[in-house]
Amino acid sequence: MIRIALTVAVISLGVMAQAQQGQPGAHFVEMWDLDGDGAVTLAEATERRGDIFTTFDENEDDILSAGEHDLFDEARAADMQANGLGRGQGRNSPANGMLREVTDADGDGAVSRDEFMSAVPGWFAGLDRDSDGVVTPADFVPRGN
């Protein structure tokens, strides 16, 4: 059951890039805000990201092999396509913070837990557009609004 819940959290990653129907970022906060206070902290993002790694590390060797990462990429892509997301932000999309080329620091085609987790602070900073130390739906409102 926990793997199902974590997989749902993973495939909801695309939702953080744009609004689903309603308030931009609301679904991201719903899935990543572990204490329910309406804001995602770096600690919460780190914990959830570790959960995501565990979900896709099928053989539990602390490495996402190319095949395991392919499954992760496919889950994210399917969610983004199903929700009409991923257009308009290009390489600057916060969703890109989990791409293999971002997380595979040594370029060997596999992503270790350390590589995946060491990318969290930069990814989180990209989400926290107002630099207040938390990610809220306000961080997803298009600039100029």
What are these regions (language model features)?
Residues 28, 42-51, 66-79, 113-122, ...:
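Amphipathic regulatory helices of Ca2+-sensor modules
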Residues 39-41, 85-90, 110-112:
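Blade-edge motifs of beta-propeller repeat domains
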Residues 33-37, 57-61, 104-108, 128-132:
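Acidic carboxylate motifs that coordinate Ca2+ or other divalent cations, activating on Asp/Glu
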Residues 4-13:
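Sec-dependent N-terminal signal peptides
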Residues 71-102:
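Intrinsically disordered, low-complexity Ser/Thr-rich linker and spacer segments
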Residues 24-38:
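The feature marks the first
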Residues 18-20:
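Boundary of Sec targeting at the N-terminus
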Residues 54, 86, 125-131:
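Beta-propeller blade repeat segments, especially FG-GAP/WD-type strand-to-loop junctions
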